[in-house]
């Protein structure tokens, strides 16, 4: 989101571009260098300065962050081919989760008991819940990069849900 904020600032205040454009480029480059998993075509969930807080037998890199990926796309961090692969993975995750839309926060969810907050159960709230406005960010990103038909297809379950519920709700499980 910082990259998007820098882009917005430089657009609003063109005189700042000389100072901030190189910083933006360095952050984008380092984001790709340290967080992009080329082999799995996804972002690494976290890099810990010390040990992971999770058990040694838990592979956190198997978790796919839908919302973070959408924001990375909006920030211009992914190529069109990577966006296509990302969308395919999101659709695959929706099917695997039995969810309605690409608004999933992440998939698969963290196992029960991994968080101090007891409400962070699998498929609850930010641990695999389906958030229409998260999905909306991906819809916007798809349109931004020319995937208009795909955006139209993926927004349909969101619109259907809003119509069926006679309103827009924060999240679904």
Regions from the language model: what does each represent?
Residues 114-151:
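C-terminal substrate/ligand-recognition segments
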Residues 1-114, 156, 160-173:
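Catalytic cores of carbohydrate-active enzymes
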């Amino acid at each position: 989101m910082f990259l998007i904020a820098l882009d917005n600032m430089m657009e609003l205040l063109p005189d700042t571009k000389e100072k901030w454009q190189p910083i933006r480029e360095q952050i984008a480059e380092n984001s790709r260098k340290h967080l992009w998993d080329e082999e799995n075509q996804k972002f690494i969930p976290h890099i810990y300065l010390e040990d992971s807080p999770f058990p040694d037998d838990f592979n956190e890199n198997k978790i796919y962050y839908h919302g973070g990926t959408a924001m990375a796309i909006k920030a211009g961090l992914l190529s069109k081919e990577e966006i296509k692969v990302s969308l395919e993975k999101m659709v695959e995750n929706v099917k695997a989760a039995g969810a309605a839309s690409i608004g999933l926060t992440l998939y698969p969810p963290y196992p029960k008991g991994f968080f101090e907050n007891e409400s962070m159960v699998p498929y609850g709230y930010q641990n695999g819940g389906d958030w229409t406005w998260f999905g909306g960010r991906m819809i916007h990103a798809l349109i931004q990069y020319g995937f208009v038909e795909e955006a139209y297809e993926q927004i349909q379950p969101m619109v259907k849900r809003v119509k069926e519920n006679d309103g827009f709700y924060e999240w679904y499980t």
